[in-house]
């Protein structure tokens, strides 16, 4: 018997086979403006590949098939390994092929390589975010290791700089590509790493014996981890490889994988060091200094990753609104919905402008002024963007309605993924305290801000008023106001970039919406049209 109760209609088809790069006008402009226009053709190519149904399916598969801890083999021998779904390995292979883990560190890296790498990172993050964890840690650790690789591991340089992903369980020197992890957090300390109890004792050959634990040990399958441990000289940073120079496994015991809210594809582990061997990087007592050198880059990636997921959520929402009809018209033509989507697009415009200005600062960090710019605005961007992500994705869910709340949609996974970047590499308060530390202790920071804001002074009254408000707060920056100061600093950083590079009507609209404390701003029809055109590559208007 043939059953047919109804015909399915007015249900949008899934967003597959789109170009993640060319559909994002703000990103395309920022890449060229900030010095990586030479990578545009390649970005368009990988944007097309990553936007396919096949790539998006890999992201889904990697999350519904989380990693599995293998502590013992069938005979009871320790394995201390992690098994991943094949989709994970394909995602990692694509990331390494596209050099998201080391583009800026190649010997012949071009000017703007940090900017190009940021764009590549952002495109991959829209497909699957968990696989970016090993990539960002490897990216941050590589420049330090290129300077400080211990003598027994000098043959690691070539695989560190390769474009290969190698998941084989082998010593690093025998592999075609390497991953580096970090181990800092302990049960009692969290962000307070000075309270770490893991001890390191120097041995006769110059290596150290480590005894202790780590509570969150990301990517336990990495070829080595940079680990904080206490020495006679204070908290220090150690290179702790998975395999020792003689080919034996190091004494790193994998105890349990974390059962996390999101980030399901990525393995986060509890580990114990039972006389593990490590090699000191730098001097005893320099652990915090070395970790902070890497922490700035991983914090930047947190902000970039959250922004990318916001961009993906917005793309799903506007694509749905373009196809779905209500009351006889496309949802995107309904005045209130069009205004909501336009404001979401405007928010992404400002974030894109600031993030890629930050990427340029990281690219030119040899210049003291650029390094200071990155030092100040990186924690500010991480604080604000990572916090914005959750309500932003929830707003995108509302555009789709009930179907956006179902697991068949990408949005539940994006929503669960969002909180991790607010926590990883320092939660919100840590970011705000870091901003205050820069404002209170870094010479030249007020001159830097003055120069950035004076450059666009007089172009918008809301911006000028917000600058004066921040100046008053900075006369005596109280710790209790750290969040407000950080948020205001971030907004002014975005506003300065918008006033400098966006069209005057769009820049002024951004300043009024984001900086007018009275609220109730209505975007003009022309601004809405421009925003939605730029946000979709001219498709959904």
UniProtKB/Swiss-Prot annotation:
Protein name (Swiss-Prot/TrEMBL): Putative acyl-CoA dehydrogenase AidB
Residues noted as binding FAD in the record, renumbered to the chain: 182-191, 216-218, 423-433
Organism: Escherichia coli (strain K12)
Cofactor list: FAD
Entry's Gene Ontology cellular component terms: cytoplasm
Keywords: Cytoplasm, DNA-binding, FAD, Flavoprotein, Oxidoreductase, Stress response
GO process terms (BP): DNA damage response; negative regulation of DNA-templated transcription
Subunit annotation: Homotetramer. Dimer of dimers.
InterPro entries per the UniProt record, alphabetical: Acyl-CoA_dehydrogenase-like (IPR052904), Acyl-CoA_DH_CS (IPR006089), Acyl-CoA_Oxase/DH_mid-dom (IPR006091), AcylCo_DH-like_C (IPR036250), AcylCo_DH/oxidase_C (IPR009075), AcylCoA_DH/oxidase_NM_dom_sf (IPR009100), AidB (IPR034184), AidB_N (IPR041504)
An MF annotation (GO) of this entry: identical protein binding
UniProt keyword tRNA processing, yes or no: no
Domain notes: The N-terminal region contains FAD-dependent dehydrogenase activity and the C-terminal region contains DNA-binding activity.
Pfam families registered for this protein in UniProt: Acyl-CoA_dh_1, Acyl-CoA_dh_M, AidB_N
Domain of life: Bacteria
Record-stated family: Belongs to the acyl-CoA dehydrogenase family.
Effect of substituting residue 518 to Q: Reduces DNA binding affinity
CDD domains: AidB
Signals that turn on the gene: Regulated by Ada in response to alkylating agents. Also induced by anaerobiosis or by acetate at pH 6.5, via RpoS. Represses its own synthesis during normal cell growth.
Primary localization: cytoplasm
Residue numbers spanned by region dsDNA-binding: 445-541
Functional description taken from the UniProt entry: Part of the adaptive DNA-repair response to alkylating agents. Could prevent alkylation damage by protecting DNA and destroying alkylating agents that have yet to reach their DNA target. Binds to double-stranded DNA with a preference for a DNA region that includes its own promoter. Shows weak isovaleryl-CoA dehydrogenase activity in vitro.
SUPFAM superfamilies named among the record's database cross-references: Acyl-CoA dehydrogenase C-terminal domain-like, Acyl-CoA dehydrogenase NM domain-like
Compartment(s) where it occurs, according to its Swiss-Prot or TrEMBL record: Cytoplasm
